Amino acid sequence: RPTWFPTGSFRWPCYGVITSFFGPRRASVPGASTYHEALDIANSYGTAIYAADGGTVTLAGWYGGLGYCVKINHGNGFVTTYGHNSSLLVSVGQHVYKGQQIARMGSTGISSGPHCHFGVTRNGTIVDPLNYLP
């Protein structure tokens, strides 16, 4: 039975192709940062976005350049961010379990096409998501 408590390990937030890695990059669209603080995973509009681990939704709405965004506090020092969604399936305060669908992929905010901007923060520091994915 799924639980919203963190398992201590992450799953991939969606299926797709990595189009931008964490770290320095050339801005893909005007206004985009040249230091990328996340992993971009591209697929088609509407592709399911899943919670990387159990936790509590702390943001579900418009978040500037990330467009429609979800943030989940996993309660163990980790916060994950899922940006550029076309629609959101969760609300602030909601408990979610690892693998629960939380959004649908889109291209909202500053974006060049449909993808999931997947960010990981550990104890307040932005870190490379690839270091925490299987």
Where are each of the predicted segments found?
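Catalytic cores of peptidoglycan-degrading enzymes
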Residues: G8-P134
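Alpha-helical oligomerization segments with coiled-coil/rod-like character
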Residues: R1-F5
